[in-house]
Amino acid sequence: SGFERVFVGEESRGSITGLHNWVQFYLEETKGNVNYLGWTGRQDRHADDDVHVVTVKFSWADDDPELEVKPMSTMLCGSTVEFEFAALTLAFLAGDQNGDTKLALGDEQLRIVCHAMRSKFGAHVGSAYFELA
């Protein structure tokens, strides 16, 4: 489901999908399942800026003995799961279901990127995540 992909992370067709939640990322790392390989931020920022959206690179063991590398996953750090769930759902329902919605969060200009999953019951969240605009 979209919720699992975004907030828990999944393995699909031999690659890591989702895992866009900083709390789950932290929990997986403390269990030894995630190996953090670095992060990137906007190049126009100074090191002392308060960055809330980060793009991380990591490997994830999960149940597979072979570690897979996810080259990029963006996360909104420091937020609650409830806030992220509400913002991502609202962007999907009120915005473009296969595109992005702009969001101002404090001084940050963000984009919420949504990807729809279609079934005979209609469109559902396939994936959604935050990016710096």
Regions found by a protein language model. Give the residues of each.
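Compact beta-sheet-dominated globular domain cores
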Residues: 82-133
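N-terminal "domain-start" segment
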Residues: 1-104
